[in-house]
């Protein structure tokens, strides 16, 4: 019975999903994040501006507004 529990634990460990592995990599999302920006649904926070789109146009790419 202990072998069965150990086998079950090993199988769960081997077949667990890695975080983010199911997310498709959209080219616009990769371009946004490589520039140090982030993706957000809806409007960007107050000190950020929309600099493009992410996830095939479903989200906004938010960039920090440069200090003056």
UniProtKB/Swiss-Prot annotation:
It is found in: Secreted; Cytoplasmic granule. InterPro entries: Defensin_beta-like. The gene is GAL10. It comes from Gallus gallus (Chicken). Keywords: Antibiotic, Antimicrobial, Defensin, Disulfide bond, Secreted, Signal. Residues 1-19 form the signal peptide. This is Gallinacin-10. Disulfide bonds join 32-61, 39-54, 44-62. Strong expression in the testis, liver, gall bladder and kidney. Also expressed in the ovary and male and female reproductive tracts. Expressed in the ovarian stroma and the theca and granulosa layers of the ovarian follicle. Has bactericidal activity. Residues 20-25 form a propeptide. GO terms for molecular function: CCR6 chemokine receptor binding. One of its GO terms (cellular component) is extracellular space. Belongs to the beta-defensin family.
